[in-house]
Amino acid sequence: MLSFLNLNKDSKPFAKIAGGKFKGKKAYVNEESDKGKNELVVPEGKFVPYPNPMYREVIYIAGQSGSGKSTYAAQYIYHYKKLFPKNKVFVFSRLKMAEILVSLGCIEIPIDDELQDMDAIRDIKDALCLFDDIDTIKEKHLRNTVYDIQNDILETGRHNNIYIIVTSHLINGNDKKNTRTILNEAHKVTFFPKSGAYGITYFLKNYIGLPKKQIDNVLEIKSRWITINKGYPLFIFYENGAKTL
């Protein structure tokens, strides 16, 4: 169930209100209790994503250029750094690192042949890794090398407490094998309704198992972004609220 109160030790924060008189108030999900509500409404301000402080997370963010992927990722990273100020944040991207990520103290990893010597599980611990649109890396051998690093962290990174954010232009991706790995491992998936309903509908139907009516209800939500929590309880949250599915 969902709540604006930290009801017990099993309650996990998933969002925080930015702006307005309720600024800083957190929203929680409790997997072990029926206390709480099926729906939360943000009375003033907007929800921003908040990391699970208890367990590492895999976050998948899919949307077109300009949709808000970088802003969403930066909000998550900002709160991650607040929770774990000693932990490093590494960025794998074909493009020059965005200024907002520079300001957060993120470390850019060059995409070059030296990556072949990297063993992510050996070299990285207690950190967050952002893989930013790596499917757009033009050199196939480099793209495959980065995919290998990403998949190592996706599948075994929990042992080293490595949080991971993966962004992509397409929710179902061009590389079906790697996309399937991401979608299977992700704890939360964020999409942007204005980026196109077809791919989102396919994901909600085939990966989440929602019926058409429920999918239509999700797509009608007035929010720039929507995040679905794949665990129990299954729920979504968005700029002005959250609800169980």
UniProtKB/Swiss-Prot annotation:
Record-linked InterPro entries: P-loop_NTPase
The protein's name in its UniProt record: Uncharacterized protein V3
